[in-house]
């Protein structure tokens, strides 16, 4: 897939050089004027534009209708939404407005209307809406703990839906302090301090002051900790070390070596080292692999903690992203260093099952297995397993598929060109209103709206239909949609 994108991208300068100059400004177009009215929050002008374009039967009237209603969604009532859905059933704007309305209903805590609307949400790709939906399922007596944790841990920014879900389940006893501390660590790792502060505050509102201090100055916070050894204190100390590591991983490593590596329980000390290693890897520091190995040594009990009874929990609380950076740090070690493949193996094996199935980690795990296999007959089983893993991804038309093919001694060949599109196949996307609207929006300079309309229209298309849609975009010189749509095919691959 990367090879196909590269070929298309290399062709772009040649084609773009021959393209016509950009069209004149479309600022006088009524749809563009309506979009400008939305930007200015000019409700009267937007309402007038909506009425005029609806009366004319303009092909983009539905977008102006959407802008007008979404601009006053806070005061809208269900009958208005129902009428909109009836006018534009099956279109992108219908589902887009339903998405917006579900968010509004969640903020209103109108769970009856939310529960009625949610099953009709076709895209179902909004994480906050998913959190609201899980909350309604919890209210109905369903066990949503696992799904709620997954949604909460995956949120990028604090939003009402996922924070409400977390706080509700925490108050109900369905989430525990360990869950909240894990969210605090994940948020700190992702540099989302507000989310980390919220999670710590769930455990105890009094933690808010400590979180503010450690976020502002982790060095000073740790210096003031003295003999605080409660479990909550130790969690806060770990967060401070993570914050410190993000600024200066070597300094944080020094703090762990000097005292904190012994003062914290094994699991927390190991996690601190793991985050020091990730931050060092992000900065491409040569000692990153050493820090990662130190994390595993502590996790395995290689260092005696201050609390002899403490031991690592069964589940490793490190993210897939952190483990991926451990692999990258390992691969920067010299090929002759045996710890290179040991660290890579350990990190990949600790990833989630879904992450381990990614071609990159299948490839590097196989390479590690080959490198660590015993010589002679004792290593035959390991080498056979590595070869089978490489064969499993060698058929993929991707970067790591190519590397696997070469590792197996083969040569990468381009896939056979698909049969030419028939006249009927080429005509089909031209008759699709969604594609027509998308191209018109892009031509007007409303690219964001056009791309969303285009992608929605691609839903459910087969391989040949995708090729035809890609061809239409190429002919119209909408190059990002040309490449993106072509890249969606799995079997019908056109490299021309």
Regions found by a protein language model. Name each.
Residues 5-13:
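Bacterial N-terminal signal peptides
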Residues 17-496:
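Cell-wall glycan-active module
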